Regions:
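Canonical Radical SAM [4Fe-4S] cluster-binding loop centered on the CxxxCxxC motif
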Residues: 1-28
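Short metal-coordination and nucleic-acid-contact micro-motifs, chiefly zinc-binding Cys/His arrays
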Residues: 4, 8, 280-283, 289, ...
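Radical SAM/AdoMet-radical enzyme domain recognition
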Residues: 34-50, 59-182, 186
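Flexible glycine/acidic-rich beta-alpha junction loops that bind and position SAM and/or redox cofactors
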Residues: 116, 120-121, 175-194, 213-229, ...
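C-terminal accessory region of radical SAM enzymes
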Residues: 196-226, 249-295, 299
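Short, small/polar residue-rich loop motifs at catalytic or cofactor-binding pockets
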Residues: 235-239
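Short, acidic, Ser/Thr-enriched surface-loop or helix-capping motifs
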Residues: 245
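Radical SAM enzyme core and accessory elements
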Residues: 285-373
């Protein structure tokens, strides 16, 4: 992962990169980093080079030069590129270049739901106006299939989350729906609002049984049969993922880099999380749902000051989403026109039963509003 630049032309309400500066990676630094990472990788290994900002396409010339360098120097290796963009700069020359490289360069779009939701979350830095109308959504859907839409839900747009998912999917995009992590979810009405939205999504996916679930609800429930491991992690931060800042310093991911942590990032230079275990005194360590929980070390650090301790409100949100996913998956299994369920279906139903019993405990009475069956 290369943090090509830190500057951005938007001022998103929830952005976790709160220490943005004008730092831009030089091509020489990029070459040095890439050479160190790629030199000893065998030709059969698939490698992904992720280019991120800020808004990455503010450094479009650098991106082109990086891709050109890697394609020439490492042409025998299986290397692909990925990038997430706010889309406002993807026009003209940028579109032509991306079209020409579409088989190896894959781009995700930050799109926060309906036009209103997106504009509420993602205004331009200079004008304060919404950025939705500056995005050529059709270009993305015509260039890649599928296209991931990173739909971030903020406290202000939570009450419209279901409509946002429906809109994104109606535009031919895959909804990678997540909750904003650069802020704390302390509004007392958030839980009740989320329950209402999950009910709507349950009904939506019941009416469209062939649709793939949005990321928020696309949960492998069978994973709860895996014994919780203290070294479990939802992503590869500090293990299979290395993030390099403009100076070429290595961090576990962008959430631990200077653009996010400022001076505190010095504590995580070269940090290796491969041997990290959750402390015994954290609720997550023995949680039955650890293997299906989308926890994030960087988000934990931002919210609680401890990479191993999740914000309590996120625990509640994640359990609600697991319950909603269980409801949808239960209905889909039971709708199958067969007299005998497969072994996989039986395992899923058993997982659902456990989720129901565990979440509907005296400690979670507020979840009774979302019946499983």
């Amino acid at each position: 992962m290369l943090i090509t630049n830190e500057n951005c032309n938007l001022n998103c309400t929830y952005c976790y990169e709160i220490h943005k500066a004008d730092r831009v990676m030089s091509l020489e630094t990029a070459k040095r980093v890439l050479d160190s990472e790629l030199a000893d990788i065998d030709d059969d290994t698939i490698v992904e080079i992720e280019l991120i900002g800020g808004e990455a396409f503010l450094a479009f010339s650098l991106i082109k030069n990086i891709v050109d360098y890697v394609d020439r120097r490492y042409r025998n290796k299986r290397i692909y590129y990925s990038c997430t963009t706010n889309g406002t700069l993807v026009h003209g020359e940028v579109q032509k270049w991306m079209s020409a490289h579409r088989t190896k360069f894959f781009c995700s779009l930050s799109l926060d739901g309906t036009p209103w939701m997106h504009n509420r979350n993602r205004p331009f830095k200079e004008s304060g106006q919404g950025s939705f109308d500056s995005i050529d959504i059709d270009f993305f859907t015509k260039t890649w299939d599928p296209v991931n839409a990173k739909m971030t839900v903020s406290p202000e747009t939570l009450k419209d989350m279901a409509d946002g998912v429906k809109y994104v999917e109606s535009r031919g995009l895959k909804a990678l729906t997540t909750f904003a992590t650069g802020i704390r979810w302390t509004r007392p009405e958030s839980v009740s609002e989320l329950i209402v939205q999950l009910r709507k999504l349950i009904e939506y996916y019941q009416d469209h049984p062939d649709l793939e679930l949005c990321k928020l609800l696309s949960i492998d429930l069978d994973s709860i049969f895996v014994s919780p491991q203290k070294e479990f992690r939802y992503c590869g931060a500090g293990k299979s993922v290395h993030a390099y800042d403009a100076a070429g310093k290595r961090y576990p991911c962008q959430g631990f880099a200077p653009v996010t942590l400022g001076e505190e990032a010095e504590n995580y230079i070269g940090c290796d999380f491969s041997g990290f275990s959750l402390p015994e005194d954290t609720p997550c360590a023995e949680c039955r749902f650890l293997s299906i929980c989308p926890t994030c070390y960087a988000c934990n650090l931002s919210a609680t000051g401890d990479i191993g301790r999740q914000a309590p409100e996120m625990c509640v949100f994640n359990r609600l989403c697991a319950l909603a996913s269980a409801k949808i998956q239960y209905d889909r299994v039971m709708r199958k026109e067969t007299d005998r369920l497969s072994v996989e279906d039986q395992k899923t139903l058993k997982a659902i039963s456990i989720i129901e019993d565990e979440i509907f405990s005296p400690h979670h009475k507020f979840l009774y509003e979302l019946p499983l069956k």
